[in-house]
A protein has these predicted regions:
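Short, positionally conserved secondary-structure boundary motifs
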Residues: 1-69, 100-101, 113, 135, ...
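Structural motif
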Residues: 76-77, 91
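Short, compositionally biased
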Residues: 89-103, 107-112
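Catalytic Cys-His active-site segments of thiol-dependent hydrolases/isopeptidases
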Residues: 113-119
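Flexible, small-/acidic-enriched active-site or ligand-binding loops
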Residues: 119-125
């Protein structure tokens, strides 16, 4: 069984930070031939409003390791974690198991477990006497695209 380090940094967002409004093109971006008639901005969006539903309960953490790659979480990605959300079956969570942080998919049934999203890693089935604390639900993953 492989283990991965997942938690490398916490950073709490500033609650009074100004809005960062970015142009939003309302026409969907086709992954085929673009339409030149649809290249105008219709509104702007604030990334804080889009990504942070509960500012006082939201924080960022940097992912480390490869156990969640099939869930779109890569080594070095920035995760947005919301402590106000209830962790449910199937949610990707930041958990602390016996004092070690990990990001995994929460499985509540048929047996409680923390599931990786990479077949090279084994599920973590919760055993009697283990301490599990869910720190929050991962709501967004931010990563750069691979260039060239």
């Amino acid at each position: 069984m492989q283990h991965s380090r997942v938690l490398t940094m916490f950073a709490v967002p500033e609650l009074d930070s100004p809005a960062l409004e970015i142009p939003l093109y309302l026409s969907p971006a086709a992954c085929g031939f673009p339409s030149p008639a649809q290249d105008y901005v219709e509104q702007t969006i604030d990334l804080n409003q889009l990504c942070v539903e509960h500012p006082a309960a939201t924080f960022y953490v940097r992912a480390s390791g490869h156990s969640m790659v099939q869930a779109g979480i890569n080594d070095g990605d920035l995760l947005i974690v919301d402590r106000a959300l209830k962790a449910r079956h199937g949610a990707i969570v930041l958990a602390c198991l016996d004092g070690e942080f990990t990001v995994k998919q929460l499985q509540e049934r048929p047996y409680p477990a923390l599931m990786p999203a990479n077949p090279d890693f084994a599920p973590i089935y919760l055993q009697e006497g283990q301490e599990l604390e869910i720190f929050g639900v991962v709501t967004f993953v931010l990563h750069k695209t691979k260039l060239g």
